[in-house]
Structures are given as structure tokens and as C-alpha cells.
Swiss-Prot record:
GO terms for cellular component: vacuole. Pfam families: Peptidase_C1. Residues 1-19 form the signal peptide. The keyword Iron-sulfur does not apply. This is Cathepsin B-like CP2. Its EC number is 3.4.22.-. PANTHER family: CYSTEINE PROTEASE FAMILY C1-RELATED (PTHR12411). Belongs to the peptidase C1 family. It comes from Giardia intestinalis (Giardia lamblia). Its main location: other.
Length: 300
């Protein structure tokens, strides 16, 4: 009975600890570590539910048309999509207890690039739930492949979040692919991409793609120290690999110490990181952040 109680206590114990935080701080990372409000009291399983198995990142190489530019010389030194297109980017959202980061980041990239292209009369928040429920080439709350979801967004597309709001964060289930809006008022109307490209591992091309046509969907390997991120330019410092995560890259820059970084929008809500965003070191493929960089295109 005593062993059972000890095991139960360990299972329900908070995943982030002061002792591990202090160890990370002792390594003097260039970024600020803490226990984010988003993760206070959460168990290891609850935090792990936000991630995907690493296999979703490793099995995707060479799975999409390559993106490149003949001229990469006129790339600006810095770019922040939030500043250049403040009317486009919606609020930071929270994927909840579902490993649907692949859907959130692809749909966010899809919507923001449509906004840059001027295809919507007003900025539209598109539905990650429709993608989770209807894209059977991916695994709903258990993860997804970036090339697969972009194939889905070109062949099928997605609808608005108003029509099909997000539920899987609380249910942790795929749900049924809807044919009507949640309120039953109208048939689901779908917007699609015409094509997609992968700019991964070509940093100048990634920078030019960001500054000329909008955000990119990227993915990286998450280590335990990343869960303690609060601010600054993250670089992996300590800990085991916990899984994979897909996010929306929205810009790049250089800090006061001359460290190049990417600006990235997460899907863990505004109580994590720099108001829901984080910066990650640029140019060394830290945690494989530069291996995949997907962009959708629209010829409407």
C-alpha cells in the first residue's frame, strides 16, 4: 500500500521543480528561466500532452517541394510580422491538453499568409479544430506531419474558427468531421492554399520568405529546459528530449549582445514565455528548429 501511495504521489507531482530550475539557472543560460504560470502544478503527463512524438519530425524530410530564391541579398536585417502587419495576426491561443500544435501552427501560418496576400476582406481566424477532426492523414491529439497537413490545406482546406470552434483541447478527442457550422446555421465553407513549399535549412531563404510573404510553420525538438523558458533568446542548455513541437515563425532579429534569433509564436496561451511568444537562437539549427519551414501560397 505504501509503495502504491508513493507511486501515486510521484505520478501526480508537479513536473517543474524549484531544484531543477535552480540547476538550470546555475548553468547561466543567456535566457531567463522560471516556472511559467501556464505550467504551475501540472504533472509530467499533462505537460507531455502538449507535445508530439519525435517521429513526426524525423520522418518528414524531403516530403515537400523546396522553396528558394535566386536573389537573397536584399533581406532586411530584422523583421517582425507583428509590427509590419499588426492587423493580420490574431491573439495567442492555447491548444489545451491535446497534441494539436501541428494543426494550430499550420492554420495560423495559413491565415496570416492569406492576410498578407490580401485574400480576406478582413483578418480571419481559421479553424484548427476542422483540421484536427478532418485531416485523417495526421493523428489529431497525438501529433501530425507538417507536409501532410499542408497537403490537406491545399486539397481540402479549413473553415473559420467561428464556424468550427476548438474543442479537442478539453475533450482530447479528434471529433467528427463536420459538414455544418457548430451552430447548425450554415454549411461549412472551406478556404484552401494553392501550393506549399519547404524552405528548411536555407536560412537566407527562410528570412526572405518571412519578410516578403509572411510567417512559416516550423517544428523543433523540445528538451526539459524549454518548459522553464520565460524570456530571452532560448538555446538548449540542459535536460532530456521530451518530444516534438510545431509552431509559427513570425520574424527574426539580433539582440544587444549580437545574438541572432528567430521570433516564434507558440500555442500555449499568453501566460507562457514572452506573452505567448519566444525567441530562439538563429543560424545553428538548435533543436532542429531550421530543418523544416513550411509556407502556403495562394493564387486566388
Amino acid at each position: 500500500m505504501k509503495l502504491f501511495l508513493l507511486a501515486a504521489a510521484a505520478f501526480s507531482a508537479p513536473a517543474l521543480t524549484v531544484s531543477e530550475l535552480n540547476h538550470i539557472k546555475s548553468l547561466n543560460p543567456r535566457w531567463k528561466a522560471g516556472i511559467p504560470k501556464r505550467f504551475e502544478g501540472l504533472t509530467k503527463d499533462e505537460i507531455s500532452s502538449l507535445l508530439m512524438p519525435v517521429s513526426f519530425l524525423k520522418n518528414a524530410k524531403g516530403a515537400a517541394p523546396r522553396g528558394t530564391f535566386t536573389d537573397k541579398d536584399d533581406v532586411p536585417e530584422s523583421f517582425d510580422f507583428r509590427e509590419e502587419y499588426p492587423h493580420c495576426i490574431p491573439e495567442v491561443v492555447d491548444q489545451g491538453g491535446c497534441g494539436s500544435c501541428w494543426a494550430f501552427s499550420s492554420v495560423a501560418t495559413f491565415g496570416d499568409r492569406r492576410c498578407v496576400a490580401g485574400l480576406d476582406k478582413k483578418p480571419v481566424k481559421y479553424s484548427p479544430q476542422y483540421v484536427v477532426s478532418c485531416d485523417h492523414g495526421d493523428m489529431a491529439c497525438n501529433g501530425g506531419w507538417l507536409p501532410n497537413v499542408w497537403k490537406f490545406l491545399t486539397k481540402t482546406g479549413t473553415t473559420t474558427d467561428e464556424c468550427v470552434p476548438y474543442k479537442s483541447g478539453s475533450t482530447t478527442l479528434r471529433g467528427t468531421c463536420p459538414t455544418k457550422c457548430a451552430d447548425g446555421s450554415s454549411k461549412v465553407h472551406l478556404a484552401t492554399a494553392t501550393s506549399y513549399k519547404d524552405y528548411g535549412l536555407d536560412i537566407p531563404a527562410m528570412m526572405k520568405a518571412l519578410s516578403t510573404s509572411g510567417p512559416l510553420q516550423v517544428a523543433f525538438l523540445v528538451h526539459s529546459d524549454f518548459m522553464y523558458y520565460e524570456s530571452g533568446v532560448y538555446q538548449h542548455t540542459y535536460g532530456y528530449m521530451e518530444g516534438g513541437h510545431a509552431v509559427e515563425m513570425v520574424g527574426y532579429g539580433t539582440d544587444d549582445d549580437g545574438v541572432d534569433y528567430w521570433i516564434i509564436k507558440n500555442s500555449w496561451g499568453p501566460d507562457w514565455g514572452e506573452d505567448g511568444y519566444f525567441r530562439m537562437i538563429r543560424g545553428i539549427n538548435d533543436c532542429s528548429i531550421e530543418e523544416q519551414a513550411y509556407a502556403g501560397f495562394f493564387d486566388e
